[in-house]
Amino acid sequence: MNRYDNSLSGLKLGQKTEYNAKYDRTLLQPVPRRLNRDDLGISAQQPFNQGADIWTAYEISWLNPKGLPQIAIADAEIDFRSENLVESKSFKLYLNSFNQTKFASPAEVQDTIRRDLQDCVQGEVKVRLNSVAFYTHQPIHELSGEIIDNQDIEISDYGFNAELLTNCTCDVQVEETLVSHLLKSNCLITGQPDWGTLQIRYAGNRIDREKLLRYIVSFRQHNEFHEQCVERIFCDILHYAEPEKLTVYARYTRRGGLDINPFRSNFEPVPGNFRLARQ
């Protein structure tokens, strides 16, 4: 068992677990970011200087001081510079532990989640608790950019291959945004499918759309966490296309009442958390 396997062996993901309905901050489990970043050759000097893992938590409930159940939806933004990412099933179990616990106010719930996540990931975390009414005037969002999915190409190999991006540019300078709804990877632990929409914004030599789409499709049988996939895509495009500016943003469909939306960039700030049609 290697160092990576040792670090992941204690995670609750993929294991039979009991649901604790009483608040328990120890349920949160960290995964060191350095494990995957070492594999990508990312040192302390990271190729991106803006970024976050943007979570939406749809299943939050607790009891008010009189014992009446309360509900909310939360946005959580975990800074990319944090030492750890949070394992998704442990986050779900942690949130479930609020179900039969009394809190004085929604603000106390929000502050508790923020504090516990910061302790888990060892970095900056922003949390905002929203009422259901907040979403009444929040329309389904669409990521801006040119869709590259409708290409008439034949694909027979679905193994991950970064070399599909070899010689992927031409000597035409552009600033453009490309979008694909065909991102699909698999959970590193369970192998369950993770479905996402990918946005790539860059400035530099024009990237060949066919090669880029083949590369995206090659994640189809690749096992890695959401955050790790986005950082891998960022590093591969930076290596093969050498853009002057680059943003990689993926919005994944929800599982277990949570969706994860990693954002990495070397030139623009983290966007707001706006739900797509598949979310």
Swiss-Prot record:
Molecular functions (GO terms): preQ1 synthase activity
SUPFAM superfamilies, per the entry: Tetrahydrobiopterin biosynthesis enzymes-like
Record field: catalytic activity: 7-aminomethyl-7-carbaguanine + 2 NADP(+) = 7-cyano-7-deazaguanine + 2 NADPH + 3 H(+)
Active site: 187 (thioimide intermediate), 194 (proton donor)
Cellular compartments annotated: Cytoplasm
Main location: cytoplasm
Residues the entry annotates as binding NADPH: 88-89, 255-256
Keywords: Cytoplasm, NADP, Oxidoreductase, Queuosine biosynthesis
Ligand binding (substrate): 86-88, 226-227
Pfam families, sorted: QueF (PF14489), QueF_N (PF14819)
Gene Ontology process terms (BP): queuosine biosynthetic process; tRNA modification
Pathway: tRNA modification; tRNA-queuosine biosynthesis
Highest taxon listed in the record's lineage: Bacteria
EC number: 1.7.1.13
Record bears the keyword Cytoplasm: yes
InterPro entries according to UniProt: GTP-CH-I_C/QueF (IPR043133), NADPH_dep_7-cyano-7-deazaG_red (IPR050084), QueF (IPR029500), QueF_N (IPR029139), QueF_type2 (IPR016428)
GO-annotated cellular components: cytoplasm
Keyword Cytoplasm among UniProt keywords: yes
Task of the protein: Catalyzes the NADPH-dependent reduction of 7-cyano-7-deazaguanine (preQ0) to 7-aminomethyl-7-deazaguanine (preQ1).
Family: Belongs to the GTP cyclohydrolase I family. QueF type 2 subfamily.
Subunit structure: Homodimer.
PANTHER family: NADPH-DEPENDENT 7-CYANO-7-DEAZAGUANINE REDUCTASE
Protein name per UniProt: NADPH-dependent 7-cyano-7-deazaguanine reductase
Organism: Actinobacillus succinogenes (strain ATCC 55618 / DSM 22257 / CCUG 43843 / 130Z)
Gene coding for it: queF
